[in-house]
Amino acid sequence: MFSGIVEATAQVVAIEHDRDNIHFTLRCPFASELHIDQSIAHNGVCLTVVRREADTYVVTAMNETLRRSNLGGLQVGDEVNVERSMLMNGRLDGHIVQGHVDDTAECTSVEEDGGSYIFTFRHNYSPELARRGYFTVDKGSVTVNGVSLTVCNPTAETFQVCIIPYTYEHTNFHAIGVGTKVNIEYDILGKYISRLQELS
């Protein structure tokens, strides 16, 4: 379980393909504190640490993860937003994030707004996806590349988020431009409500 408050960015230093799996080696400030079997969110995707050295660690993404996320497009040198799992004795500063990415979305616009930034994203839409809770609501929560954000101006297939300078500079949002594919996780509460309505 995560909160969507990104701790740092990690740099991809090696990529190894193993049949349908990809092993990613990453370097980040807290790598030396990690241990095997620990869960880390990478651009919002929960992955397990399988190997660790002094300042790097390795995680494996399987086919299902690669199909639903942007991890398969990573290259050596890319920045990835990372967050360790949430401590249950602390404040929930973001929102409840599972690290189970639902789909990807494409950035269609980046606008400067008096020192902050407004990003517009287009995501897959169908009535079936909406029935499963894959939609956004105004002032609801959404996770973009692992960052907990508030939705603005949603339509059936687009939404906007407002990014303050700190978030822009300390996450990989500064590398997102028109055409960039990002990972999105819809609000778990909306998915549960949609499922309950479907079963009632």
Please place each PLM-identified region on the residue numbering.
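Conserved loop->alpha-helix
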Residues: 1-200
